[in-house]
Amino acid sequence: MTRVLLAEDEPLLREILVEGLVDEGFEVQAAVDGLEALVLYRAQRPFDALLLDEEMPGLTGRQLLRLLRGEGDRVAAVIFSGNLVLEAGEQAGLGIGPVLRKPVSMRELCAALHAAIAAAKRPPGP
């Protein structure tokens, strides 16, 4: 089963996402913010993918990824936000899969997770 760590600070949205992802066959661990996600990630790895809200208290999705990438971790990652725009260089540099704009459909979310997981399994380029 594909393990996903979800970090979303809005309780209702977090609950909806967990239920939807579980219904789609994912095993989901949920965190209320970026700091809790970091603690859960380190304690319960391996995860196949991270699904991160960009705008959270503590650590943003990008800040969390910078920490993990700095430790050499290449876990698949999808960021979603109501208003985030990333430059292609920053997105590639952090190894972020698709960046999704809220609201997002479960179909789009699942497709993004599968794409990010497949990309993370490929060997890094030169």
Question: What are these language model-derived features?
Answer:
Residues 30-49:
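Acidic, metal-coordinating helix/loop segments flanking the phosphotransfer/catalytic sites
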Residues 15-23:
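Charged docking surfaces used in two-component/phosphorelay signaling
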Residues 53:
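Active-site residues of response regulator receiver
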Residues 56:
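Receiver (REC) domain active-site loop signature in two-component systems and cognate sites
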Residues 8:
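Conserved acidic carboxylate
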